């Protein structure tokens, strides 16, 4: 583990939300009780295993996580490249589309191509009011 990198990431606001489960078996009872301890998991917490599914490329795998291909130093560099300052004011339409439109949806609206906002369709032809590849 790279404790220095984990401290830097924690100080930058990286945190795993949620709690951990603790299963206690009491001999006098025949039922196992599941006790949930609700607290956030900080990266520089000594109880955190390096096998957690935290990756700086935005992928967080909850179940069956394998070993990350990122070293702690690479993770810090990747996370530090993004802005840590909160955004103030509004954002433009194009920036909103780039950041918040799911990439799985090619066209998030239904209807004729003339009704789509131009920002959602990279191959929209404003002159013919058609989308390349559609009949």
From Swiss-Prot:
Organism: Human adenovirus B serotype 3
Family: Belongs to the adenoviridae pVIII family.
GO cellular component: viral capsid
Feature type site, description Cleavage: 19-20
Pfam assignment, any one: Adeno_PVIII
GO molecular function annotation: hexon binding
Name of this chain's protein: Hexon-associated protein
Propeptide: 1-19
């Amino acid at each position: 583990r790279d404790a220095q990198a984990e401290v830097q990431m924690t100080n930058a606001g990286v945190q795993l939300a949620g709690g951990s489960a603790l299963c206690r078996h009491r001999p006098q009872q025949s039922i196992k009780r599941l006790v949930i301890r609700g607290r956030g998991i900080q990266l520089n917490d000594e109880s955190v295993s390096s096998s957690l599914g935290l990756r700086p490329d935005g992928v967080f795998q909850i179940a069956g996580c394998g070993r990350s291909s990122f070293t702690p130093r690479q993770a810090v560099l990747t996370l530090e490249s993004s802005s840590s300052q909160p955004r103030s004011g509004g954002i433009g339409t194009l920036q909103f589309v780039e950041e918040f439109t799911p990439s799985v949806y090619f066209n998030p609206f239904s209807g004729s191509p003339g009704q789509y906002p131009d920002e959602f369709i990279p191959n929209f032809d404003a002159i013919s009011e058609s989308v390349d590849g559609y009949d």
